Design a protein with these regions (language model features):
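Gram-positive cell-envelope targeting signals
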Residues: 1-106, 304
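Solvent-exposed, non-transmembrane regions of membrane-associated and secreted proteins
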Residues: 74-323
Length: 323
């Protein structure tokens, strides 16, 4: 009967309501409702899984992109470090080669040309502080062949690794990042102020050098104060074609870039005498220097610090010329 009635519906002989009732019974009897539910559940599951896959895929792309960015930053940082290291090494190797080719250490006694005396005619330097460490013998002809801008050679007795040729450029920028061979290198050169006399005859000669992290150039200069190296020796040497000049350190301080430490004087007047006395009083350590006066010849060694506006400065006055 159900089949006949259903067939009659299909032939258009039953009403729409009856047809719907018979159709629903037919679906119910054959379990087709559960099939519809299952189909709907299956469709929802597929949609949910598709959404999850899309979400997972987008999340995966994000992390991959983040990884690639991190990798790029790492590679760039490594490149920077390697470049800096190679630059440091190049500078160190160059100065070592120059030192080996142009200097030798000698233990031969030095001949006195002139030594500083006080107003009473007594030597400024006491006998117990006579020369115990000779400066290097410098072949200035060989140095001048490398660079005609060379004006001297600097060496600190307490820190013998601070032993470098001194240059002078037409301005204070040229040798800031150029070596003695005039090749670009961040370490640059040890150089005197462009306005100073090249023979160190000025009242105050300023000598600049970088505070290199690898300890080269003036990278160890602060050890004179911070590590107490001045206790080993408070003397430094400047060798020139005209002679070997010995200087006694009388001041070590941190100074602002605009400080009067960098004042240049045209003559040994009272103003310069006041300046020398002031520098001695500003020293982080009382060097107990005797006989400071307006007649002194001063060299000012200056290097940068971690503070861009501050410099570490070591000042010394001439006490003798030798050969």
């Amino acid at each position: 009967r159900k089949s006949a009635q259903y067939r009659n519906f299909r032939c258009g002989r039953l009403g729409t309501g009856d047809a719907c009732r018979y159709r629903l019974r037919d679906l119910s009897d054959h379990g087709s409702f559960s099939g519809i539910t299952k189909q709907r559940d299956k469709k929802g599951y597929k949609e949910e899984m598709t959404a999850k896959k899309k979400k997972k895929k987008s999340g995966g792309i994000f992390w991959k992109l983040l990884f690639l960015i991190a990798l790029a930053v790492f590679c760039f940082s490594m490149y920077q470090l390697v470049t800096i290291y190679l630059g440091y090494k190049q500078g160190v190797d160059e100065y070592h080669a120059v030192a080996e080719a142009t200097t030798v250490q000698s233990s031969e006694p030095l001949e006195v040309v002139e030594e500083k005396k006080d107003e009473e005619g007594n030597l400024i330097i006491p006998e117990e502080e006579e020369i115990t460490v000779n400066p290097p013998e410098v072949d200035f002809d060989a140095l001048k062949a490398i660079n005609d801008d060379v004006v001297g050679w600097l060496e600190l007795e307490a820190i013998p690794s601070i032993s470098y040729p001194i240059t002078q450029g037409e301005d204070n920028e040229y040798y800031l990042h150029r070596t003695i061979k005039q090749t670009y290198n961040f370490a640059g050169s040890i150089f005197i102020d462009s306005t100073n006399a090249s023979d160190f005859s000025d009242c105050n000669t300023i000598i600049y050098g970088h505070n290199m992290k690898n300890g080269s150039m003036f990278g160890k200069l602060k050890q004179m104060y911070e590590s107490g190296k001045y206790k080993d020796s408070k003397y430094l040497w400047i060798c020139t074609p005209d002679g070997k000049y010995r200087y006694e350190i009388f001041s070590m301080q941190y100074a602002n870039v605009n400080s009067d430490v960098y004042t240049l004087f045209s003559e040994h007047d009272d103003q310069f005498g006041v300046y020398v006395d002031k520098m001695a009083k500003q020293s982080k350590v009382n060097m107990k220097t005797k006989g400071l006066s307006k007649d002194d010849y001063v060299v000012t060694l200056s290097t940068c610090t971690s503070n861009e506006s501050m410099r570490f400065v070591v000042q010394a006055r001439w006490v003798g010329t030798y050969k």
